[in-house]
Regions:
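Charged, low-complexity, helix/coiled-coil-prone segments
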Residues: 1-4, 50, 148-155
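Cofactor-cradling patches in redox/metallo enzymes
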Residues: 2-12, 17-88
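Short acidic-hydrophobic, aromatic-tinged amphipathic segments that line or gate anion-handling sites
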Residues: 92-98
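Active-site loops and adjacent core secondary-structure elements that bind or stabilize anionic groups
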Residues: 98-173
Length: 173
């Protein structure tokens, strides 16, 4: 994942500072400041990475770092980025589907003419995803009496449960 993105970006004349895996947020932020980074990219291969990405976005906001944050990797998604990561910071957060799309996204983010359109489209997409997510979780509660009136009718009168067979072997009821 991240290694492929690094190679693809480097082949397109971008300088990539690869800090490795499981790097603390503080180290990434310090490196971004030290190298005057234009973009920070995070890759998530395992599920716990998703929470770390949210924490990292919070730290970027706390530090006042406004540069774009690219999100990618096997466990990531547009929906997770829109619902969990993007709202945690005021700067741009862009989910990139795969390594081949990292170059056009990076190019657009660094081009003053393309950047506004990309960010506007991304934010509109994220807003729609957040709205859909919110609606999905808003299910009206059915009153207890209505739920009881709608129960499955089962006639228990006269029902005799089967008696378990005695002994070993396969049995049929």
């Amino acid at each position: 994942g991240k290694n492929i993105v690094g190679v693809v970006l480097q082949c397109n004349n971008y300088t990539v500072i690869d800090l490795g895996v499981m790097v603390p947020a503080e180290k990434i932020l310090n490196a971004a400041k030290e190298h005057d980074a234009d973009i920070i990219g995070l890759s998530g291969l395992i599920t716990p990475s998703l929470d770390e990405m949210v924490n990292f976005a919070v730290e970027m906001e706390r530090e006042g770092l406004e540069i774009p944050l690219l999100i990618g990797g096997a466990t990531t998604s547009r929906a997770h980025t829109a619902v969990k990561i993007s709202p945690r910071r005021s700067g741009p957060v862009v989910w990139v589907k795969d390594a081949s799309r990292s170059v056009p996204v990076a190019a657009a983010l660094l081009d003053d003419r393309q950047r506004p359109a990309l960010l506007e489209a991304t934010e509109a997409d994220y807003a729609a995803l957040r709205e859909r997510h919110a609606q999905k979780n808003e299910r009206p509660m059915v009153p207890l009496e209505k739920a009881r009136a709608n129960r499955t009718p089962i006639e228990w009168e006269g029902y005799t449960p089967p008696v378990p067979a005695q002994g070993l072997g396969v049995r049929e009821f």
